Amino acid sequence: MGLEEKLPSGFLLTTVEQAAGWVRKASVFPATFGLACCAIEMMTTGAGRYDLARFGMEVFRGSPRQADLMIVAGRVSQKMAPVLRQVYDQMPNPKWVISMGVCASSGGMFNNYAIVQGVDHIVPVDIYLPGCPPRPEMLIDAILKLHQKIQSSKLGVNAEEAAREAEEAALKALPTIEMKGLLR
């Protein structure tokens, strides 16, 4: 004697946030920010063998104003960091970021002054994807995990507050590793 038996068939009970999340996850438009080896794997993911179109990502967008997902693939130099931030700021809300590869996530093997030790110091990151470089299957798995996160995301004032908190955390983040080794 559950709720399903009391309602006539053809009815669906949900919330506005769940319905909007279901629609949003099926129409994510990625912008590429490929900087190194990981960019090759990201391009492979969009090709015929892996076919990102089945997840609602027909084409990588050339303009950040048409995208709501930024895939940062590869190492980010100190000179490239302001450009990365500018591209992120030009994206419309809601926006998400995948940090693809160990170089984007933590600086990787480039432990020196010229490379940002994790893009989470510049933009808030939603999904971290490990690997050097990660395989296309791993990127697809990260996109599916992002779909789950998008489907459960908040709307309105709650979304603005969550975005503001993530932004502040990204700007206050401490370096992930201490620079040691041959250079110090």
From Swiss-Prot:
Annotated catalysed reactions: a quinone + NADH + 5 H(+)(in) = a quinol + NAD(+) + 4 H(+)(out)
Binding note for cofactor: Binds 1 [4Fe-4S] cluster.
One example of a Gene Ontology biological process annotation: electron transport coupled proton transport
EC number: 7.1.1.-
PROSITE patterns cross-referenced by the UniProt entry: COMPLEX1_20K
Localization in the cell: Cell membrane
Membrane topology: Peripheral membrane protein
Superkingdom: Bacteria
Annotated keywords: 4Fe-4S, Cell membrane, Iron, Iron-sulfur, Membrane, Metal-binding, NAD, Quinone, Translocase, Transport
Name by which UniProt lists this protein: NADH-quinone oxidoreductase subunit B 1
Annotated organism of origin: Streptomyces avermitilis (strain ATCC 31267 / DSM 46492 / JCM 5070 / NBRC 14893 / NCIMB 12804 / NRRL 8165 / MA-4680)
